Swiss-Prot record:
Documented EC number(s): 3.5.4.27
Compartment(s) of residence: Cytoplasm
SUPFAM superfamilies listed in its UniProt record: Methenyltetrahydromethanopterin cyclohydrolase
Organism: Hyphomicrobium methylovorum
Function statement: Catalyzes the hydrolysis of methenyl-H(4)MPT(+) to 5-formyl-H(4)MPT.
Name of the molecule in the record: Methenyltetrahydromethanopterin cyclohydrolase
InterPro entries on file: METHMP_CycHdrlase (IPR003209)
Membership in a protein family: Belongs to the MCH family.
Gene3D superfamilies reported in the protein's UniProt record: Methenyltetrahydromethanopterin Cyclohydrolase, Chain A, domain 2
Alphabetical UniProt keywords: Cytoplasm, Hydrolase, One-carbon metabolism
Pathway: One-carbon metabolism; formaldehyde degradation; formate from formaldehyde (H(4)MPT route): step 3/5
Length: 178
């Protein structure tokens, strides 16, 4: 999550800048860091980030702002739905992590999902993109380890194991955020 109080800027970010900045606990937990003078970030937000946000992102990445490439797209645009769909493998990896499967035992992975049609309402657009991943996404992880560990992952990974499976994401979001 990217926020800036003065301007009220709020957005979600994905891309290699996350690993370079290491602001998320996950990267510390995994003891993973990237290094380099350049990076990129895709922002899911309704407007371009202000200069202060760009400078702050570059600072956290330890790079000159000129080495930072930022793309942004609204959730309700075609570009937004495409970049959200591109996260389907990340969703599978997050679930594997939540299941306490050793991420170093995931050798490779591939995933596909339908691209949700754009919709002009933020909550409905977010719902459609997440529903596409939850109900239409398919991930294939190549793992090493014991048969029992692989079986536990295979049985726990599908979204159908979630108690709210079958409920549209927009309804789940409304229930949580009122």
């Amino acid at each position: 999550t990217i926020t800036e109080e003065t301007t009220g800027f709020f957005a979600l970010g994905s891309g290699p800048a996350r690993a370079l900045s290491r602001v998320e606990d996950l990267f510390k937990e995994l003891n993973y860091a990237d290094q380099g003078p350049n990076t990129a970030l895709v922002i899911e937000g309704d407007k371009a980030p202000p200069a202060a946000v760009i400078e702050n992102i570059a600072k956290h990445c330890g790079i000159n702002p000129k080495g930072l490439s930022i793309l942004y797209a609204t959730t309700w645009s075609l570009a937004g739905t495409v970049q959200i769909a591109a996260r389907v493998l990340e969703v599978a990896m997050h679930k594997a992590h939540a299941l306490h499967f050793a991420l170093e035992n995931i050798i490779d992975g591939t995933a596909t999902t339908p691209i949700a049609p754009p919709f002009p309402d933020f909550v409905k657009a977010m719902g459609r993109t997440n529903d596409a991943i939850i109900y239409g996404g398919r991930a294939h992880l190549f793992v090493k380890g014991t048969d029992a560990e692989a079986k536990r992952l295979a049985e726990g990974l599908p979204s159908s194991t979630c108690a709210s499976f079958g409920k549209p994401f927009a309804e789940i979001f409304a229930d949580v955020n009122g």
